[in-house]
Amino acid sequence: MSFFNLDRFRFQRDNAVGIHRKSPDGSNSDKENKQAHQRKADGQFPSGKTSRQVLEDVSSDDEVVRMGKDSASDLQQHINKDMEDKIIKLLEIFPQKSKKDLLEVIENTSTLDGAVAHCLMIYGDEDSGGRKDKGGRSDDDDQPKKKRKIQRSDSSESEDEDSEDEESEEPSREKQEALLKKLKRKLPDIEKEVLRDILKEHDWDYENALGSLLVFSSTDTSSPENQKSKQKSKSSHSKEKTDKITQRPSGSSSLSRWLTAASSHVPEVSSMSALKTQKSALSKSTSKNSSFKRKRGDEMPLNDVSASEDEDEIDSDVDSMSDDQDSEDEDSISGTLQDKIIQFLQDASLDELALISGCSIKKAQKIISLRPFNTWKDVKEQFFKDNGLSIDLVHGCKVVLKERQVVLDLMGRCEKIAQKMTKDVTQVIEAGMGSIKQPKVLNSNLKLQAYQLIGLKWLILLHQHKLSGILADEMGLGKTIQAIAFLAHLYEKGIKGPHLITVPSSTLDNWVRELGLWCPSLKVLIYYGSVEDRKYLRQDILTGLIDFNIIVSTYNLTIGNDHDRSLFRKLKLKYAVFDEGHMLKNMNSLRYRHLMTINAEHRLLLTGTPLQNNLLELMSLLNFIMPSMFSSSTSQISKMFSTRSSEEESSFHKDRIAQARLIMKPFILRRVKSEVLKELPPKMEKIEMCPMSDAQHKLYDILFKRLKKTPNGDKRELCNVMMQLRKMANHPLLHRQYYTSDKLAAMSKAMLKEPTHYDADPALIQEDMEVMSDFELHNLCREYSSISGFQLEKALILDSGKFALLTKTLAKLKEKGDRVVLFSQFTMMLDIVEILLKHLDHQYVRLDGSTPMAERIGLIDKYNTNPEIFVFLLSTRAGGQGINLASANTVILHDIDCNPFNDKQAEDRCHRMGQTRTVQVIKLISKDSIEDCMLRVGQEKLKLEQDMTTDEGEDGAITEQMAELLKVSLGL
C-alpha cells in the first residue's frame, strides 16, 4: 500500500503538541494503530490517557483541540449552551455513559460528529453488548431508530474484529468482502476500491476504518444543532486554523497539504464533497498501477455517458435510498420512495424478499402472508406490530431498491450502445455477401462459405466500433475458421498481435492445425508443457526472444498458477479469443475471475450453446465482453440475480431478462445449420427403449426400493441417489453385487501370497475392496495371479439390456457400410464396451479425458483416414467439443447426459460441414428406469432452450434443478 494512501488518515498534530511515532517505513500496520504518546507543551504527560488514537479531520473547519490541565480556566469559558446541547445529544445516543465521561469526550473534540465518532471507537464494543441485552425491553422503542441500528451493527463488527485479532493475519477473501459490503452500506457514496484501500490501511479493522471516515466527514450535516455549532465555531477557529496550516510539518503527505489548503480557501464546502474529490484523486493514483483496470477509452468508445451523469441518474430517484443512518424513521421516507417500497413488498418473490438484510425465509413468508400492502399505513401497521417483523426490514428495502436501480442504470447504458450498433449489424446481415471479400493472406485453395463471410464482416464491424462480441453459431458451422479469418484480416490491416486463443484441452491440436492450414502467415506459439517448460517459455515471451502473432493455450494452463496468470496480465494483448465461451456464464466462479484479469483490449467469445434464460448468466457474458461498463457493479448484479427461485419469477426479473436479451442482440451472432447450410444432409434421431435383462431388472428394483427408504432432504444426497440409479440402468457391474463380503474376505487372504502384499493386513485389504465396483474387482483379479480364479464370467460382463440391443444394431450398421461414433458419460462404461467390441470382433479407437493431448489429434486422423476402423469410442465431455468426425454417419449415445445440450454437441461431431450422408442419432434408454425420466425432462429443456450446463462439474454430474425434477418424476 503506497504511503500516499496511508497518509490520508494518519494522525497529525501541530508543532505545539508532539507525537512520537515511528516513520511509516515498515509494513506493520499494528504499530501504526497503536496509541500515540502525547505530551503537553511543557513536556509532561497528561493525566487522562486516551484508549485510542484520535484522528484529525484535515478537511473540516474545526481542528481537534486537546486541552491540558493548565488550560482549565479556558475550558470553563467554552462550556456554554452549545456544549450542553452536545451533552444532551450524546446522552441520547449513549445513555449508558455518565455525563462526566461524555464531557471528557467533548473536551477532546470540537464537533458533535467528531464526539460521536470518538465514542463509537472507544465504547463501541461495550455498547453493542449492552444494546443486545436491552433488545427485549419495551422502552427500547423510545430510542432513535438510527442509534439502535448502529449499535446492533457494531455488535457484529466487534465479533469480526475479535476473530481477526485471534487469527493475527489478513482475513479470508470472503471476510474481506463482507467487511467491504458492511462499510459500503454505511458510506454508499464512496467507491468500493477507496473503501478497500482504507480497510487495508487499518489492517481490515472495520471499526477503525469507519471511525476514520466518520471523523474525516465530520462536517456532514446531520442535525440543525451541528449547523449552528459550525457557524459559531467557524469564526473563533479561523485564525487558529491559519496558524496550524502554516505550522504543518513538511513531512505530511501532498494529499493532506492539498486538502488543508483547499479547506482554507473554500470553508463552506461540505466534507462529503471533499471526500468525493479526494476519492477521485485516490482512484486516479491507484488505477495507474492496477493491472486489473481496462482501458476505458479503447474498450467503450460508444459510451458517451459520463460517470457523473450516471451517478446523477441513479441518485435522482433514490436519494433517500442511500442508507443514511440519520433518517432511520418512517417520517424521513419520501412519498415516492414509500410507493416503491409498497410495490416491492407487494410484488417481490420469496427469494427477492430474502435479499433484504435480516430477512430470513420465514420472515419473507410472513410478509407474503400479510399481503396486500396498498398504502403506507398498511405497511406501518404490519411492521410495527409484535408479529416478528421489524421496521428495519422496511428500511432494508431501500438497499435492495438501490441495487435494482444500479442494474437498471447499467442496462440503460448498455441499451444506448446496443441501439447504435443494431442499425449497422442489421445492414450487414441483410446485405449478405455484397463487397465482402476473403482476406488475401488466407490460403487461396480454401474458400469461406457465404455465411462465414457475413460472420467475418460482423466481427470487423465490432472491431471498428472497438467493441467485443460473441460468435454463437450452431456447432459445426465453422466458428474456428471465422475467428481465424478475422485475425487474418487484422494482420492485413497491420494489427499483428499478439492475440491469445484459449481453448478446451481436446481442441488445442485442432486449433493449431486449422491456423496452419488456413493462414500460414500467422506465427503461432503453443503455450503448453510442464511447469518447467512453461517457465522458460514465459521468459522468452516477456524478453521478446520469440516472435509470434498468436498464443494458443488451454483454459487450465492460461490460469493454471500464479506465474501463468501473471504472464497474461503483463502481456498486452490485442484480442483474447475464448472457445467454448459458455464456460464463462458464472461471474462468481474462480475461472471467470481469473480470466477477467487477462490484459486484452478486446474479447471474442465462441460458443455453440444457446444462451440460457438466466439473467445472471446473460449479465456475466455482458460483463465479460464489456468489463469497463460493469466493473464497479458486479456485486449488485450477482446478489440480485444469483438466487434461483423455486416459484414463478417476479415481473422485475422477467423484464430484465427481456431487456438483457435485447441489449445483447447486436453483440451476439447466432446462425443455425438449417438456415445457412441448405445442402447439409438431414439428421435423424431415433430413441431405442432397451428392456433391462432379467438379472439387471431385479437388481435395479432392489436398489430403487432401498434408496427410496433413505432420507432425501439433502439435495446432494438426492443427486447421489440419481447417479446410483443411472449406473444400475446402464450396467450391473458398475455396482458391487456379485462380489459378496465372503468372497472379498477370501480374496483379501489370497492377496497375501503376492510379493507386494505379503505383510499386509487382510482386513485393510478387504476394506479397500468393499468400495470398488464389480468391474473394478474383476480387473483386479486379472491383474493379480493369486486371485485370478475370482474373475467374472464373460456372460455376466455382457449381461445388459443395452448390450443386447447394441449387438444387433452394430451388426446391421456394419453390413450397410456405416461408421459409428459411440459416446458414454462414464469411462468405466467405455471399458466394458471395449470388451463387447472385442467379443464382436469390431475394430475401434478410443478417446477420453485421460488420453494424452499429444495423442488425440493422431487418433482422430487415424479414424478419419482408415475406413476399416468401425467404431470411435468417446467420453461425452472430453470428445463432445471441437472434434471433426464427419467421416462417421451414425452417433450412438449409450447413456444420455443430464444436460441435453451436451448430447447435441456430441451429435454435431458428425453432423457438420463436410458431411455427405444422412446422420443417424441413436439414443439408448433403459426402459422403466431413471433414464426414461431424464429423457422426458431433457426434451422439455430443449423446447425451452435452457442450457443446464454445470460449472466445472464432473462427468455425469447432476444439477440440483435436474435432481428436483427427477425426484418428482420418480415419486421419491
UniProtKB/Swiss-Prot annotation:
Residues 247-263 have a biased composition (Polar residues). It catalyses: ATP + H2O = ADP + phosphate + H(+). SMART domains: DEXDc (SM00487), HELICc (SM00490). GO terms for cellular component: chromatin; nucleus; site of double-strand break. The keyword Hydrolase applies. It is found in: Nucleus; Chromosome. Residues 805-966 form the Helicase C-terminal domain. Keywords: ATP-binding, Chromatin regulator, Chromosome, DNA damage, DNA repair, DNA-binding, Helicase, Hydrolase, Nucleotide-binding, Nucleus, Repeat. It holds the Pfam family Helicase_C. A motif (DEGH box) lies at residues 579-582. Residues 460-628 form the Helicase ATP-binding domain. Residues 82-127, 175-218 form the CUE domain. One of its GO terms (molecular function) is helicase activity. Residues 15-76, 125-177, 217-333 are annotated as: Disordered. DNA helicase that possesses intrinsic ATP-dependent nucleosome-remodeling activity and is both required for DNA repair and heterochromatin organization. Promotes DNA end resection of double-strand breaks (DSBs) following DNA damage: probably acts by weakening histone DNA interactions in nucleosomes flanking DSBs. Required for the restoration of heterochromatin organization after replication. Belongs to the SNF2/RAD54 helicase family. This is SWI/SNF-related matrix-associated actin-dependent regulator of chromatin subfamily A containing DEAD/H box 1A. It comes from Danio rerio (Zebrafish).
